[in-house]
Amino acid sequence: MKWKKYTIETTTAAEDFMSSMLMELGIEGIEIEDNIPLTKEDQADMFIDFLPELPPDEGISHVSFYIEDDGSDQSDMLRKVKLGLEDLRDTVDVGSGVISSSETEDLDWINNWKKYFSSFTIGDILIKPTWEEVKPEDADKFMIEIDPGISFGTGKHETTQLCIKQLIKYIEGAKEAPTVLDVGCGSGILSIVALKLGAKEVVGTDLDADCMISTRDNMQVNHLDEKLGTFYVGNLIDDTELQKKVGTEKYDIVVANILADVIIPMAPVIPDRLKEGGYFITSGIIDFKENEVKEAIEAAGLKVIEINHQGEWVNITAQKLTK
């Protein structure tokens, strides 16, 4: 299926008026591009480690919308858009108001990413996408299959690999099968690795409800009993009901492959989740945030026992010492 993309050059002052006008005409799927700087509140809400530098804001905005290119005459719709644009001139500076057009394919965005995800190994563990066959040379490896679906997490990212290496170390080295809390479980890859390595129970949390579906599906693909995993939607940082559901002093390992700006405010709630002697394994930490995360973990009362690097990413492992 093809789509016509129409882009209106306007001003940042008019972009909201323009969007409202298009929606009143029944047009959905509106896209706004501008260089308005983000506020500190916006940046905090985004939970990202660094922002790309934007060009200077010159007050120009591009408002785009899409109409299915089914061969029908679109001139009437465009006429209404142009009339609406002219009406707005009485209210706000709409700038040039020039409308340009282009064609775009209806790409299968849910599946196109698959060409970038292929099998890889971490030690003796083979992590492969569900749609890929096992290569003969990998037939004797310990296999985990993952289909992230529309949730985040194939396992190939350095931060996930750092966490997996630590899970291998601390689960295989445990005297008894551990219980694991996976914060920000995503596709469930770390929960599944933990269970495959011998964890007796996994609890996972994520802000995205779609992750619950992906995690359950991936557990089934890996022939894991669903009773071994319990998963909740919510924010462990400040959701007291979720904290009650997750429990206190219950876990031998808490693993969190999330961003530094999430780990820092989350650190104070981790000690209460861990048993004495339990481990907090975390990554998703860009290198220039290492000290800040380390200080937050130590301030929460945990002892940092190991720091590992892979590329520009960092793993910090800490322990809750016995009293």
From Swiss-Prot:
Q: Where in the cell is it found?
A: Cytoplasm
Q: What does the record list as GO biological process?
A: methylation
Q: Which domain of life is it from?
A: Bacteria
Q: Name one GO cellular component term.
A: cytoplasm
What reaction is this protein's catalytic activity?
A: L-lysyl-[protein] + 3 S-adenosyl-L-methionine = N(6),N(6),N(6)-trimethyl-L-lysyl-[protein] + 3 S-adenosyl-L-homocysteine + 3 H(+)
Annotated residues that bind S-adenosyl-L-methionine are located at T160, G184, D206, N257
The GO molecular function terms of this record are: protein-lysine N-methyltransferase activity
Q: Main site of residence?
A: cytoplasm
Q: What class of enzyme is it?
A: transferase
Q: What Enzyme Commission number does this protein have?
A: 2.1.1.-
Q: Does the keyword Transferase apply?
A: yes
What the protein does? Answer: Methylates ribosomal protein L11.
User: What protein is this chain from?
Assistant: Ribosomal protein L11 methyltransferase
